[in-house]
A protein has these predicted regions:
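Conserved catalytic alpha/beta cores of large enzymes that bind or transform nucleotide phosphates
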Residues: 1-27, 34, 45
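Generic secondary-structure boundary/loop-capping signal
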Residues: 2, 32, 43, 104-107
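A charged alpha-helical hairpin associated with nucleic-acid processing machineries
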Residues: 9-18, 47-234
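Short alpha-helical basic/polar micro-motif
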Residues: 28, 36, 170
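Short amphipathic alpha-helical segments
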Residues: 31-33, 82-83
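Flexible beta-alpha connector loops of hexameric P-loop NTPases
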Residues: 39-45
Length: 234
């Protein structure tokens, strides 16, 4: 069940946008601030049933052009919630965004502290979910060393490989090379394409940042499937 869905569903259908918050006080704050497409999960993870409902509401004839925006607290719990949302949402990622409140505040507290405009600004500050997930994972690695850059690529190449839009996949492969500091973007793109060709059960999606760091540091999981070797990272 999504709290606020009855009030928001007409606006969701008209605006082709859904803003997902975590608590019922947050959804009330959003609506009071004029963000009338907000719904809340109220303590449960945003799952497949929620996704199916939202996608039905945002359909416009046979042409999908909806935008799903997750808002999370700026703490570790919010970061993990965003990672779980990505797992639910991998096939829908091109239309998904993440907005993180400053100073670890939830939307209700943010409105009380800074007013209605702060919530509208929060929604406007959204970033693509792929960008958020990749940058979250990269935080767990030291990119100042060749070893850290290789481990970071091993963990994040499978994320980029889940992007079904090939043009977007190529763009994120090149961005990933820049974020990691890898000197040859074509090497990263080559490994993304190789990962994308693997059977689905061989691919690894990020579980949460803590586990991601553990598997990357051990050099396990994708490991040798990521081709750039440390000789290319000076």
């Amino acid at each position: 069940v999504l709290f606020g869905i009855d009030k928001a569903k007409k606006n969701i259908a008209e605006k082709h946008q859904t803003v997902v918050v975590e608590g019922y006080t947050d959804v009330m704050a959003m609506h009071a601030a004029g963000v009338d497409t907000a719904v809340a999960t109220c303590g449960t993870a945003f799952g497949g049933d929620h996704m199916s409902l939202i996608r039905r509401l945002m359909l416009d004839d046979s042409f999908f052009r909806g935008e799903l925006i997750y808002t999370f607290d700026g703490d570790e719990a919010g970061r993990k919630a965003a990672m779980r949302a990505f797992e639910t949402d991998a096939e829908f990622g091109a239309q998904s965004f993440v907005a993180v409140a400053p100073d670890g505040m939830d939307p209700c507290d943010l409105r009380l502290a800074r007013g209605d405009g702060a919530l509208r600004d929060l929604v406007a500050s959204r970033v693509p979910v792929y960008e958020f997930v990749i940058e979250s994972l990269l935080q767990d690695y030291s990119l100042d060393s060749a070893e850290g850059r290789v481990q970071a690529l091993r963990r994040t190449v499978p994320v980029v490989a889940t992007i079904s839009d090939k043009v977007l996949q190529q763009e994120y492969a090149r961005r990933l090379a820049g974020w990691v500091g890898w000197p040859n973007p074509d090497e990263v793109l080559e490994q993304v394409r190789a990962e994308a060709k693997k059977p689905k059960k061989q691919k690894r999606a990020p579980k949460d940042p803590a586990r991601a760091a553990g598997s990357g540091a051990a050099g396990g999981g994708v490991g040798a499937a990521v081709g750039p070797d440390s000789s290319g990272a000076q």
